[in-house]
C-alpha cells in the first residue's frame, strides 16, 4: 500500500493483503478496493482466479473472504462498476477464447457473481490487437453522458504493442462497440508496453488514468506506474479520447 498527497511522491504504508491472510499460493495481481457500507472490499486475482478480501480500513489489513474463488474456472482482472440505476456489476477476463472480457451482475452481498447472467463483452477483433497473442484484458468501466465506457488492454503484456482501447455501450451488460480509432494509448513518447489501467477523479474533478509500462524499450521488468489525464473531444462527429500530462510517480 502506498499513499500520496500530490500523486507525484508516494509513501510505503505496508502490506494491504498479507499472504498469511489468504490461502492462495501465487500469482497475486490487479487489486481494486471499494468502500461498501462500512467495509472496504478488495477484488483481486490470485493463481488465475477471482477472489475477494475485506478490511475496516482502505489500508488493510485485508483478509480473504471464504476459501473458494468467485468463479470455479480460471478468470482474472476483475473490476467493479455501478449501473446508472445503482446496480453493481463486475467485469472480468475469462480464458475460454484467449483472454476475453465478460460482465455480470454482482449479488447483493457484493461477494458473489450472478453466474446465470454473465454476458460476453468482446474478444480480440481489431487489427491492432493481433500483434502478439490473443488477448483482451484489464477491463474497467465508467459512465459518462448516460453511456458506459470500457477501457481495456490488448496484446500480450510483454509486447511493446500492449496498449489501450475503448468500447462503449448504452447498457451495462452490453452490447459493447469498440471504437474504430483504437488504440487511444500505445507507445506514447518513449514508453512501450502500456496497459492494464484504472482511473479516478482527482481533487479538481479531472478524470485521471493510471497504467503501467515496460522498464525500457528493451526490458519488460520491472514495470513502472504512470498517471495521466483523460481528455475527451469530438472530431468528425465522433467522440475521441487522448491521454495528456503523463507523469511517473516516485517513492520515498
Per-region residue spans from a language model:
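Carbohydrate-active catalytic/glycan-binding domains of CAZyme proteins
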Residues: 1-252
Amino acid at each position: 500500500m502506498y499513499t500520496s498527497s500530490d500523486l507525484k511522491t508516494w509513501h510505503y504504508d505496508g502490506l494491504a493483503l498479507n499472504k498469511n491472510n489468504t490461502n492462495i499460493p501465487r500469482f497475486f495481481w490487479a487489486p481494486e478496493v471499494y468502500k461498501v457500507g462500512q467495509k472496504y472490499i478488495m477484488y483481486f486475482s490470485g493463481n488465475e482466479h477471482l477472489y475477494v478480501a475485506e478490511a475496516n480500513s482502505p489500508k488493510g489489513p485485508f483478509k480473504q473472504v471464504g476459501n473458494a474463488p468467485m468463479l470455479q474456472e480460471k478468470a482474472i482482472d476483475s473490476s467493479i462498476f455501478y449501473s446508472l440505476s445503482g446496480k453493481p456489476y463486475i467485469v472480468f477476463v475469462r480464458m475460454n477464447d484467449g483472454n476475453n472480457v465478460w460482465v455480470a451482475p454482482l449479488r447483493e452481498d457484493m461477494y458473489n457473481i450472478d453466474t446465470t447472467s454473465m454476458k460476453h463483452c468482446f474478444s480480440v477483433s481489431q487489427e491492432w490487437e493481433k500483434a502478439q497473442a490473443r488477448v483482451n484484458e484489464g477491463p474497467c468501466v465508467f459512465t459518462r453522458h448516460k453511456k458506459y465506457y470500457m477501457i481495456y488492454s490488448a496484446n500480450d503484456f510483454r509486447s511493446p504493442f500492449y496498449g489501450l482501447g475503448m468500447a462503449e455501450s448504452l447498457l451495462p451488460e452490453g452490447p459493447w462497440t469498440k471504437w474504430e480509432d483504437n488504440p487511444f494509448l500505445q507507445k506514447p513518447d518513449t514508453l512501450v508496453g502500456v496497459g492494464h489501467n484504472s482511473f479516478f477523479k482527482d481533487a479538481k474533478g479531472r478524470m485521471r488514468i493510471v497504467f503501467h509500462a515496460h522498464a525500457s524499450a528493451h526490458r519488460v521488468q520491472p514495470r513502472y506506474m504512470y498517471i495521466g489525464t483523460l481528455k475527451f473531444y469530438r472530431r468528425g462527429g465522433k467522440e475521441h479520447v487522448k491521454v495528456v500530462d503523463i507523469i511517473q510517480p516516485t517513492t520515498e
